[in-house]
Amino acid sequence: WARRCGEESGMMSVDMGGPVNKAAYVFGTASIAAGNYNIMAAVMIGGMVPPIAIALATIFFKNKFTAEERKAGPTNFIMGLSFITEGAIPFAASDPLHVLPACVVGSAVAGGLSMAFGCTLMAPHGGIFVVPTIGNPLMYLVALVIGSFIACGLLGLLKKKVSE
């Protein structure tokens, strides 16, 4: 199950709001209807990681982003914490070969950890605003932090320095 949820979480990062992302989201919401709440927890965390990781990377790896990207980076904290994956799209569009793999790995790790920690979610959306509805919320936040920092670290390793 943890591997499967890691896959669903990774799918949330593949196209950042596109059809693969939506397929994972629909699977998560259908799981709620079926009474399986851990899949939705993994799906939501997978959608939260990319924008949070990008926001972190624009702070820790400033030389890997343009001035415009660094300025836009912190907005992704708010979007990520709100489960709005689409904040990561401009960053993924400008460097898909480096941004997407980093985000997919971070999301998959976060989702797998969420599942391994037994986290559940009965709400289909909401990010940090639905933390009170999350089963095992502390470990959910731990999984979110770990996945976000893994993706952030990979962004620092994979992205090339930007010359302005």
List the model feature ranges, each with a label:
Residues 1-6:
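Short, small-residue-biased leader/transition segments that mark boundaries at the very start
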Residues 7-163:
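Pore-lining transmembrane helices
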